[in-house]
Amino acid sequence: MPQNLENKSGLYKTNTLGFGIAGIILFCMAYSQAPLYYSNQNQYFLHGFTKAKLGYLEKDWLGNTTDPTPLFSGLVCLSITWINENIFYLYYAMLQGVFLSCAWIIYHRKNNNKTFEIGHYALFSAIFILINSAALRWLSYRLFAQDYPWFLQAGVAGQYILGAMFQPSNFGVFLLLGLSLFLVEKHISATVFTCLAGILHTTYLLGGAFIILGFQLYLVLDGKIKKAILIGILALLLVTPSVFYAAGNFQPSSSEGFKEAQEFLVKFRLPHHCLPQLWLDWVACLQILWIMLSIFLLRKQKALTVILVPFLLGALLTLIQVATKNNTLALLFPWRISSVLVPLATMIILSEFLSYCNPFISRLKPFVPSVVLSIILALLGIAIPVFKAGFVIKENENGILAHIKTNKTIDDLYLLPVNVPNLASTTRGSLSSDFKPIGKKTTDTRIVPIDMQRFRLYAQAPLYIDFKSIPYKDADVLDWHRRLLLAQNWQKRLLDNKSPELLLEELRAQKINHIVTNANVDLEQSELELKFSDDHFKLWKIKEARNP
């Protein structure tokens, strides 16, 4: 190769790499992250923290139930033991980078793999960053009391890929990456990444199967039958261990118990995720139309099959669930494929629109304005959590949590105030609460209560039960529900101050020796010792029973 061509090739690769790294950094900053430990992290980090033997979490009941995400928990355990908790921010940023890379793959494909034009890519990236930015979402909530941009990156039923923080659902980016790679003829790597999502989080096994079937139909229609069979076999080999783990560890303990546990999950704890009659509102309908628009734009391309098949299979199983009201099917979330197809649709539609406008864009010289916009969004994305304009937590809990973290002992077990919402009657549609002010967040009956969510991970102490964090094995779900009812009953009796001696004996029988109450609660102190009090909470220690 002539020297000048080698130099141009090297410069091209350098420019592309530099643009990619800078774009990912700006996207991660603009998208933003919630502080540790936020929302679902308090459930999904627990098994990892328990395995790492942090504090006295090995004594926590929930931390010792069957783990639905063992590989994720293993990563959490290793990271918190050998590195530092801040590594979780980096893990999430890497997955955010995969998300943006998928958008670039889609845009590059639409431009027929033409020479890299930095101005065009900068404009595409800036608009994509804007759509997904924390700043736009914050502004939407302030203007309309709803986070509307969220619905361009999330699926129906309150299900999504990225969200606010590092958690198992993030691995759905590998389904998106699989689809993106297949669209540029990387069939084997597409299959591997699609399966990787299901390996890391079994909830993606069904959606992954939809996508693999779409791959196979595409290849069959393209006359590549042997390759279609090959990727089917490869996919089966890759996901078999995960399927066996799920089947072996979450098989029914008994037919009646399994049925009852599913009923609790579907109609009591997860109705906003499980019942189409609750989540199918006008926004969800628009999201479905958004997916259909992306399919329409691909109507003259063979790639149509790759997206159409998972969409139709998800829709078909959703209709079957609605018709049969089958709880098992509801808990498989066939509509969860929308959490992949909606952001993919956004990428496709944006790529198609900008490609149509290419002649006009070339005259604009958009590089500098695009970079400036991206930098502004990145700075705002950093500012939002720093100034507590989003991802807010109940900071009035910090005092009591810090006290417990410092003063806990190995025999302690804590009873917290339990707030049990009626989600089946208060939920309609889906929403993101990441940018709600704390006052509205704590009073919105559509949101799972956020009270004391951080207790286990922050204080590293075991508690008896809470509503937010749940197990998934049927026997554990039944035990969770039993504990929840007991906690509600005890809480009512504490406030009524009825038969306190009998109540305390029941608590001692469950090995509960500490009670957290609101600051305005005064309890009879003959059998209790006040260990902590501030303007928000009190901590009571149950004295040891007197010998008869």
Say what each PLM segment does.
Residues 233-236, 357-383:
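Signature aromatic-anchored transmembrane alpha helix within multi-pass, membrane-resident enzymes
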Residues 386-548:
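Extracytoplasmic
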Residues 163-189, 221:
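Membrane-interface transmembrane helices that cradle and orient dolichyl/undecaprenyl
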Residues 1-27, 115-123, 548:
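Start-transfer (signal-anchor) and selected internal transmembrane alpha helices
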Residues 24-100, 112-126, 137-171, 202-203:
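Active-site lumenal/periplasmic loops and adjacent helix-entry segments of GT-C-fold
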Residues 179-181, 189-202, 211-213, 235-237:
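Membrane-interface alpha helices of multi-pass inner-membrane proteins
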Residues 28-45, 50-52, 56-57, 61-69, ...:
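Transmembrane catalytic cores of multi-pass membrane glycosyltransferases
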Residues 1-14, 110, 183-188, 217-229, ...:
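Membrane-interface junctions at the ends of membrane-embedded or membrane-associated helices
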